[in-house]
Regions:
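Electropositive polyanion-binding surfaces
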Residues: 1-404
Length: 404
């Protein structure tokens, strides 16, 4: 029939972290895990995140699942949430999975971290996942999803923790497979609560303001692209697509990134501009994001009153369900959601800033020791009206101002 069923299974952290417990209070305070170069500051103890909350190969694990039915063009027809118990058949790295999709088992074995045994059922599942992700991505691009073509590099360290080089991160499509499936699950959860008119901590991304757009319009004019005074998402997507393969790609895509507002956490239903979605929440990383853990608790309330998601009533029954869930403490009220949303938005900014600053420090330390006085290739990403150029180095992705 060409129809698909996608199942996305996420570790049931809420099953092990009780509301109001010491672990929960500390997780709330931290807001999220912080990923610094060579150091992770976890939101919850590693005995949980690397133990019973880790979906390990060959081990049964409690999960929450989103089941999404899609038509042959990737349009969502129905969704269902449930508590589940899964038994992971195989752990794969991204490059290993990509090689298997491409039919190269020899290359796959070079990237494995587990026993390199690949059953036909696994290979077929990978190929189907690849096909479905491409269908979903094509649908999202038609809907206006923005895709920034910005390079990413990972630092290479010696045994003493000092940077000795940088190398491009792999661009395997398997990263996109996971991304597309996670986005579908996040939307399915957000839609479920929107359909019931229930409050939820959402991930929101407002439209950029037109004041911020003016600088982007100037960048676009330099490369011969005329953005209207009040561009919409389609206009910005056209600019990104038109410059994706040009020498100006990085500068333009950086300019778009600077123009876009920062996504935050809020109970407001204002959608996600970059994803071209009306309803979005974070559900897929409760190990490392407190908003996801709050969403999981809200899902627990929903599942308790719908026979594990199997019986979601309509009509008057839906109104009764809404009233019942509205009195369940696991579904926080808007005041509490606003408070947590602001806090977790702030902790996210702090964690990202710490990662960025430490990375820049380590790279600059390396450049000062090994490349002082050398000429290095870079891209001009911004010109100050009163003089000076901002340059981003190609290989190390650090920015600096060159005075004129």
């Amino acid at each position: 029939s060409g129809e698909w069923e996608l199942g996305v299974h996420i570790a049931d952290v809420a099953n092990f972290v009780e509301t109001g417990s010491e672990i929960d209070l500390e997780a709330e305070r931290r807001g999220n895990s912080a990923y610094l170069p060579r150091l992770v500051l976890p939101m919850i103890p590693e005995t949980l995140s690397n133990g019973v909350c880790s979906l390990q190969e060959g081990v049964p694990r409690f999960t929450k699942s989103a089941f999404i039915n899609l038509d042959k063009r990737g349009r969502v027809m129905s969704t269902r949430l449930a508590r589940t118990l899964i038994h992971s058949r195989k752990r794969l790295t991204y490059l290993e999975a990509q090689a298997l999709i491409e039919g190269d088992q020899k290359l796959a074995r070079q990237h494995t971290r587990a026993e390199p045994a690949y059953e036909d059922e696994l290979l077929d599942a990978l190929r189907r996942a690849d096909k479905l992700a491409r269908i979903i991505r094509a649908r999202r691009l038609r809907d206006g999803m923005l895709v920034l073509g910005l390079p990413e590099f990972e630092l290479v360290f010696d045994e003493d923790g000092r940077v000795i080089d940088a190398q491009p991160e792999d661009d395997a499509f398997t990263h996109t497979i996971i991304e597309m499936f996670m986005v579908e699950a996040n939307e399915a959860v957000a839609r479920t609560f929107s359909d019931l008119s229930l409050p939820l901590l959402r991930r929101v991304h407002p439209e950029p303001t037109f004041h911020d757009i003016e600088e982007l319009r100037e960048h676009a004019r330099v490369v011969g692209f005329n953005l209207p005074e009040e561009p919409n998402r389609t206009d910005i997507k056209s600019l990104l697509d038109a410059t994706r393969s040009s020498p100006a790609s990085r500068a333009i895509h950086f300019a778009v990134l600077r123009t876009l507002t920062k996504a935050t956490y809020s109970p407001a239903i204002i959608g996600h501009f970059a994803l071209a979605g009306d309803h979005y929440a974070h559900f897929t990383s409760p190990i490392r994001r407190y908003p996801d853990l709050m969403v999981h608790r809200a899902i627990d309330a929903f599942l308790d009153h719908t026979e594990n998601g199997r019986k979601v009533p309509g009509g008057k029954g839906r109104a009764r369900l809404r009233s019942t869930l509205g009195g369940d403490s696991r579904i926080a009220d808007e005041g509490r959601l606003l408070e947590i949303g602001r806090h977790c938005s702030d902790t996210e900014v702090a964690a990202e800033g710490a990662e960025r600053d430490l990375r820049s420090f380590l790279v600059i330390q390396f450049l000062a020791e090994k490349h002082l006085g050398d000429e290095l290739p870079g891209v001009v990403t911004h010109i100050r009206p009163n003089g000076g150029l901002f340059v981003s180095l190609d290989r190390y992705l650090v920015d600096g101002m060159a005075s004129l």
